[in-house]
């Protein structure tokens, strides 16, 4: 329920569900009745979104249908056989000014996750669109990517 029905609209829901489960295992019933009630109310009142579920199911369908891409050369460890010595250098997103970077590793213009207008997903929509715009404008030229 917390992942499939609520998802990113209220990312705390998965923690609430996990905490409730752990408490039920630790203290048992009937003592954990209130814990379960609190978790159930949280889930019932949380905004709902299945965008995360739809995204992973779409990605899995792509894989099943053979529409996959090889691992980008810059992601293959320099210690592995088969890495070309002239492969593009890995550009760590941790070192990018925004902590995310513009490197698009998929290599194709394909989108799986589309946030809804529900809950916290509504707040994620614009930053995600901004990131996608920056990645499109950066293109595949390693010189235009964030270091």
Model-derived features with residue positions:
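Conserved P-loop NTPase
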Residues: 102-104
